[in-house]
C-alpha cells in the first residue's frame, strides 16, 4: 500500500433511537445517529405487520384468483 493516500479508519459509535450503541470502523470520523437497527427493526424482531389500506390485498387476490385456478 502506498503511504499517505489511504483514509484513516476510526472507531465511531452508532447510536440508535432504541438506545442500542454499536461501535464500528469508519472513514467518516464522526458518530452516527440511526433511526432503526437490528435490535429494533420490525423484520428482525418478528413484529412485522402488514398494513392493508382499503382492502387492497383482498381486491388483488380476488382479481387474480381466476388466474391462479388455471
From Swiss-Prot:
Keywords: Metal-binding, Ribonucleoprotein, Ribosomal protein, RNA-binding, rRNA-binding, Zinc. HAMAP family: Ribosomal_bL31_1 (MF_00501). Zn(2+) binds at residues 16, 18, 37, 40. Binds 1 zinc ion per subunit. Part of the 50S ribosomal subunit. Pfam families: Ribosomal_L31. GO terms for molecular function: metal ion binding; rRNA binding; structural constituent of ribosome. Binds the 23S rRNA. One of its GO terms (biological process) is translation. It comes from Shewanella baltica (strain OS155 / ATCC BAA-1091). The gene is rpmE. InterPro entries: Ribosomal_bL28/bL31-like_sf, Ribosomal_bL31, Ribosomal_bL31_A, Ribosomal_bL31_sf. Belongs to the bacterial ribosomal protein bL31 family. Type A subfamily. This is Large ribosomal subunit protein bL31. Coiled coil: none annotated. Its cofactor is Zn(2+). GO terms for cellular component: ribonucleoprotein complex; ribosome.
Amino acid at each position: 500500500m502506498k503511504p499517505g493516500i489511504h483514509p484513516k479508519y476510526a472507531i465511531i459509535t452508532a447510536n440508535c433511537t432504541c438506545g442500542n450503541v454499536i461501535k464500528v470502523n469508519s472513514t467518516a470520523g464522526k458518530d452516527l445517529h440511526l433511526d432503526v437497527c437490528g435490535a429494533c427493526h420490525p423484520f428482525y424482531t418478528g413484529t412485522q405487520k402488514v398494513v392493508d389500506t382499503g382492502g387492497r390485498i383482498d381486491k388483488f387476490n380476488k382479481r387474480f384468483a381466476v388466474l391462479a385456478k388455471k
